[in-house]
Amino acid sequence: MSEPNADSVTIHIDNMLRALSSAPSEPTILRVSVQLRSTNPKAYDPEIIAIGPFHHGKVQLQNMEQHKVKYLKQLLQRRNESSAERYVIAMREIEDRARKCFGEAIQFNRDKFVEMLLLDGCFVIEFLRKFQEKDFRDKDDPIFRYRHIQGYLLHDLMVIENQLPFFIIDLLFNMTKMDHQDINYIIWPLLQIGRSFFPKIDIHEIPEAPHLLGIVHDIHCSSFAEIKYYIESEYNTEKIDSAIGLQEAGIMFRKSEENSLFHIKFKNKALSIPVWEISDVTESLFRNFIAYEYYFTGSNKKHVTDYVFFMNCLIHSPKDAKLLRRNGIISNILGGDDMVYRVINQLGKNTFISEKFSYSKIFHAVNNHCGRKRNEWMVKLRRGYFNNPWALFSVLAAISMLLLSIAQTTFAVLSYSHDLKKDS
């Protein structure tokens, strides 16, 4: 290789090394990987609003840009402020820190980036405030005139690529809060999107998380996270059978009244599972929770991933979904059992047993039950004969013939014995 080429390579590598040393080691807002996105790309895209830089400028999201400016204006008017200067100054002071939170170089100049932080951050806070306080709403505000728009916005705030660093939200909230408000005040509306999955939620304190999606995830998982459900083992956890297969092995399914969706128990040959509502928001919300766990929780706290893996083991077909629905475990508002199967099957793609799998104890106990010889024999008998009415009829007929043959033989022996006694 010639010396000039060597010099150009050296220069190029040195530039890469310098860029690497100045880059954040752990960005907190990332784009979803190709593998995760491939199963359902729409689940990771906002519907109507871009928050943060990743989806900024998309044509289909432009209508909401004017509402960001309107909400900032209404905020300033409510606070009797004529200028946004102090907020711009605050955003400039943390611009560099905010840039390092994103997993790629943001191609905005300094002014554009600061403007985005301010408009997006204030919109998020004002929308959540107005969601709580009707007195803050403008009577002509279409966002609160049409309920479906609120639903879209709540959805978009739970998209992993559509986030701002939480310290931006926290700073702007504290700069604009009223006396009776704390940060819990604006978190509560975000919990409503998952209220059908996590019905009983109390916010004692805001968990440390990089953004709003992470906070909502951690709140929903908090009660379950305190329980050590996994077992340390040198062996890999084996999958359990489908719901139909477990039923054939003598395992019953019961609806649980636990507060947390994730609190599954196995006792006295019964799996107790809380109700899971399958709706039009299920797949998107759970996919973004799974993506958050994939990137940010390391080997711990993969509770949503573990739960989806568990349910994906149980539901291998629409028949499994039907069995769980009939036992009150699945609440289906999408349509038929085939839709439930499709959603859970799709959610289960690219999910794996985590290092500290939340349900390893349950899997171990269930597989122990199903592995006993008498249970294996019963499974084979049920699968081979009792699932087919004609096969069952044949078995019963054969048993009847056997009993009849035994009776005839017994009668013949007794008759012969009686005749011998008579002759003697």
Annotate each PLM feature.
Residues M1-F386, V413, S417-S424:
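Acidic, Ser/Thr- and Pro/Gly-rich low-complexity regulatory segments
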Residues R374-T410:
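Membrane-interface recognition of transmembrane alpha-helix starts
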